[in-house]
Amino acid sequence: MSIYDEKKEKVITMTVTLILVVILICIKVTHFVIIERPLKQCRIVSAYHLTVDTNGAQIDHSWLFEKDDLTYIDIAKTFEQTYFVTDYAGGSGDSGALNELTIAFGETMDGMPDIRITVSENGYIQINGKRAYPLSLKYAGNRLYGHLLECLQDGADRQQ
């Protein structure tokens, strides 16, 4: 084997090693940025308050934030601070009406939200999304509902 062949083999080995290292770094960065990104770094792309009757028919649907008018809020505050909101004075006068709050966090390349959290005042919590974030919900459903609503309204007031 000549010196030229040894150098060529060494160059090929180094090139393959370098390519593998770059691929591994890209995978790790993608994993951290896309999958392990903390919830508090996501932006709220939309949030709306929905009131439905006992049959599930929509009574009132009011946007807290429109997609064209994004509001940035420290999401960690939503889950870490306690607002003792026991009732939300709104919606319809129907005694069987159920208030529901949906918040969409983040945004994927196709424009869909990363994750949606829907909290009803009866305590029902639904989490949907393309990625599963490690959420720790510290509150009962109705307290979390009022708490999220208060934080969103507080954020809207601060934006104006």
Predicted regions and their residues:
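Function-determining sites in protein domains
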Residues: 2-160
